[in-house]
C-alpha cells in the first residue's frame, strides 16, 4: 500500500545550499513504537540540493509502511468487528421468534399446570376432609347401631323373660283351673255322699219309732253343709277373681311391653335399614372418590413426567443458548481487548506521527528559501523520491532568509 504524504512543498524545493539534519537534541529521544526504526535516523549529514539523504528516506519509508500496516490491521479488525456484530444481530433476530414465544408458552403452560395442581390438591384435600367426615359419621352410626343392637338384645331378653313368665302363669292358670275342676268334682262327690248318707239315715229312721226325748236340739247338717259349701264357693270365687285380675293386669302389662318393644323394634329395624343404605352409599362414594383420586394421581404423574421432559429439553436449549452467549461474550471480550490494543497502537502511532510532523516542520524551516525550484544546480530534479543524492555542487549563491511555511496537513491519505 503506497503512502502519499500531504507535503507538496517538500518535493518542489530546490537549493544549492546545504541544511543541517535533525538537531542533536533529538537524536537520543525514544519515540513510542519506534523500537524497529533503523539506527541511521538522525545522523547529521548535509542535504544535497534540498533532498533527504538515503537513510532518512529509508526510515520514513519504513515508518510509512509500518503506519500503513497498522492502519490496514485496524481497518481489518473493524471490518471483522462489524461482521461479528452483524452475525450477532442476525442470530438474535433468528432466535428471538423461536426462543422467547416458546419460553412464554412454556411459562404459561407451567403456570396453568401449577394452577391445575393447586386445584387438584385443594380438591384432594376437600375429598379427604369429606372422607374423614364420612368416616366419622359412619363411626357414629356404627356406635348408634351397636347401642341400638344392645338395646334390642336387652328388649328381646326381656321379652323372652316375660314369655317365660307368661308360660309359667299359663301353667299356673291351668293348674288352678285343674284344681277348681277337682274341687268342683270333690264338691259334687261330697254332695252325692251327703245325699246318700241323708237318704240312708232317713230310711233307717223311717222304720223306727218316734221317741221324743228331752235333749239338746239337733244340728241341721244340711244347713251346715250349705254354709260350708257357700264359704268354700266364696273363697274359690275370691281366689279366682284375684287370679283373673292378676293375670289380666300382667297380660295387659306384657301386651303393652310387647307393643312398645315391637314399635321400638320396627323403628330400630327401619333405622338399621336406613343406616345400611347410608353406609352402602358412603362406601360407593368412597370407592368412586378413590378411583377419582387414583385417576388424578395417574394424570398428575403423567403430566409431571411429560412436562419434566419438556422442561429438560427447554433447559438443554437454554444451556445451549447460554453457552453460545458465553462464547459470543468471550469473543466480544477478546475483540474488545484487541480493539483496546489497537487503540493503544493507534495512540502510539499518532504520537509518532506528531513527532515526525514536528521533525518534518523543523526540517522544512531549515530548507532553502527558493521553494518553487524543481531542479538543483546540476540540472537534476530533487524530491523525496530521488534515490541517489546529487553530486557535489558549486558553492551556493547567497539567498534571502526563508519565510516559515505553514504546517502541512496530517498524513491521512492512503491509496490502495
Curated annotation (Swiss-Prot):
Organism whose genome encodes this protein: Mus musculus
Chain residue ranges for the region called Tail: 364-416
Name of the gene encoding the protein in the UniProt record: Krt31
Keyword Ubl conjugation set for record: no
Region (Coil 2) residue spans: 220-363
Residues flagged as site, Stutter: 305
Pfam families the UniProt entry points to: Filament
Residue stretches making up the IF rod domain: 56-367
Name of the featured protein: Keratin, type I cuticular Ha1
Note: There are two types of hair/microfibrillar keratin, I (acidic) and II (neutral to basic).
Source superkingdom: Eukaryota
Location of the region described as Head in the Swiss-Prot/TrEMBL record: 2-56
Region annotation Linker 1: where it falls in the sequence: 92-102
SUPFAM superfamilies according to UniProt: Intermediate filament protein, coiled coil region, Prefoldin
UniProt region (Coil 1B), positions on chain: 103-203
Region listing for Linker 12, in residue ranges: 204-219
PROSITE patterns: IF_ROD_1, IF_ROD_2
Keywords annotated in UniProt: Coiled coil, Intermediate filament, Keratin
